[in-house]
From Swiss-Prot:
The keyword Protein biosynthesis does not apply. InterPro entries: A-D-PHexomutase_a/b/a-I (IPR005844), A-D-PHexomutase_a/b/a-I/II/III (IPR016055), A-D-PHexomutase_a/b/a-II (IPR005845), A-D-PHexomutase_a/b/a-III (IPR005846), A-D-PHexomutase_C (IPR005843), A-D-PHexomutase_C_sf (IPR036900), A-D-PHexomutase_CS (IPR016066), Alpha-D-phosphohexomutase_SF (IPR005841). This is Probable phosphoglucosamine mutase. GO terms for biological process: carbohydrate metabolic process. Its EC number is 5.4.2.10. Activated by phosphorylation. The gene is glmM. Keywords: Isomerase, Magnesium, Metal-binding, Phosphoprotein. GO terms for molecular function: magnesium ion binding; phosphoglucosamine mutase activity; phosphomannomutase activity. The lineage of its organism: Archaea, Methanobacteriati, Methanobacteriota, Stenosarchaea group, Methanomicrobia. Coiled coil: none annotated. It catalyses: alpha-D-glucosamine 1-phosphate = D-glucosamine 6-phosphate. It comes from Methanosarcina acetivorans (strain ATCC 35395 / DSM 2834 / JCM 12185 / C2A). The active site is at 91 (phosphoserine intermediate). PROSITE patterns: PGM_PMM.
Length: 434
């Protein structure tokens, strides 16, 4: 039984992720943990899944503390006082999706071994149902957001920048506007009222979805703009000229400021630009599978200073192994206080990148990748820890099945003629899909 993808359990509500499944996850988790903290993002289905999880946890004898609607990094930080954390979220996915993500007390998402243990236990119904006098207690804690803010404010310097913030009607609305104000910023908010229908824009904070933010940054003459996804584990940015800052650019900028003159180790996924390697020359760059849990595992394994994903997940191990879009927003304020974001971008090497995605049923992904590997292997050095990445003379290409959606993704990067590399991979994928 395979339930976990690259970002926990996730799927369409009442089809792939149901109250029955949530109940089973709760029973298995509650059979192995004595205490748990649970939170949720604003999506419409989140309370239903949360109730089912709480029922399962308490039925197995686990005491549960509910922190309400919070961001994923807030929940992961709250988990430090419990044996585990449970977050109901589908992150950047649309309204019809819901998911469950599990956290260890150090802010690390459940690793592969822990995920497999839960999958096996559900399949074999290996869980407890305690007697009435041992049922777990349910409590509420309203301090999780304040605690997270206090942590960040103790690490980041104040600034008087003007910032436009687009929370995308997600959970970031509960914390980021207030945090930046307390750090001295003048904050202009967009879509900062939680709404699980995500009426303003798609929750994913990519270039295509942030047209309003880009216009607002210019109109209000702001120093830069910030955007979150549905649960604010992600953070993306727009410079003062209204230009979207790519994930690879932010990854490199954060890496430079975290490493400083000491260099160090930085962990990134296989789909990361070679720009990061060149800009962080002298630092060791470790590549992992795509997914924040794998990046976090790499950070822990190699004792890295920092790690992140171009999708907008930034992990700062000095505070947590959870991607923290809230801390990243505050950290970027501190960085831009010293130099404009457009000037920082101008320092970066520029390579052409092209990305695309094609529908592919989950059950057909393995067969597809075998066909793709056969075609790509003769072309160059292969890294196959997650999909197939081939190093070419002029760049590289990665073909990788999505861990959260029924898609296969292509990423190509080159010093020149990126279209040729992309189209070559596209042709191979399309033929394999027939």
């Amino acid at each position: 039984m395979k339930l976990f993808g690259s970002s926990g359990i996730r799927g369409i509500v009442n089809k792939e992720v149901t109250p029955e499944l949530a109940l089973q996850v709760g029973l298995v988790l509650g059979s192995r943990k004595k205490t748990a903290v649970i939170g949720r993002d604003p999506r419409v289905s989140a309370p239903m899944i949360e109730h089912a999880l709480v029922a399962g946890l308490t039925a197995a004898g686990c005491d549960v503390t509910k922190v309400g609607m919070v961001t994923t990094p807030t929940l992961a930080y709250a988990a430090r006082e419990y044996e585990c954390g449970v977050m109901v979220t589908a992150s950047h996915n649309p309204s019809e999706y819901v998911g469950i993500k599990l956290w260890n007390p150090d802010g690390m998402a459940f690793d592969s071994a822990q995920q497999e243990e839960i999958e096996d236990a559900i399949e074999n119904e290996n869980f407890l149902r305690v007697t009435w006098d041992l049922i777990g207690k349910v409590a509420e804690n309203g301090n999780a957001i304040r605690d997270h803010m206090d942590l960040i404010e103790g690490l980041v310097r104040d600034s008087k920048l003007r910032v436009v913030l687009d929370c995308g009607c997600g959970a970031g609305s509960t914390i980021t506007p207030y945090l930046l104000q307390e750090l001295g910023c003048q904050v202009i908010t967009l879509n900062s009222q939680p709404d699980g229908h995500f009426p303003a824009r798609n929750p994913e904070p990519n270039d295509q979805n942030l047209s309003l933010l880009k216009k607002a940054v210019v109109a209000f003459e702001a120093d830069f703009g910030i955007a979150h996804d549905g649960d604010a584990d992600r953070m993306m940015a727009v410079d003062e000229k209204g230009n979207f800052v790519s994930g690879d650019e932010l990854l490199a900028i954060f890496g430079r400021f975290e490493c400083g003159d000491e260099k160090g180790t930085v962990v990134v996924p296989v789909d990361t630009s070679m720009m990061v390697d060149d800009y962080l020359e002298g630092s060791e760059i470790i590549r992992t599978r795509v997914g924040d849990v794998y990046v976090a595992e790499g950070i822990k394994q190699y004792g890295a200073i920092y790690g992140g994903e171009p999708s907008g997940s930034w992990i700062f191990p000095k505070i947590s192994y959870c991607p923290d879009g809230i801390y990243a927003a505050a950290k970027l304020v501190e960085i831009v206080r010293e130099k404009k974001l457009s000037e920082l971008r101008a320092e970066l090497p520029v390579y052409a990148t092209k990305r695309g995605a094609f529908p592919c049923a989950n059950e057909k992904k393995a067969e597809l990748m075998e066909k793709v590997k056969t075609k790509l292997e003769p072309l160059g050095k292969v890294l196959d820890i997650d999909g197939i990445r081939v190093e070419l003379e002029n760049g590289w290409v990665l073909v990788r099945p999505s861990g959260t959606e029924a898609k296969v993704r292509i990423t190509a990067e080159a010093r020149e003629k990126v279209d040729e590399i992309y189209e070559m991979a596209e042709k191979i994928v399309k033929e394999a899909l027939k």
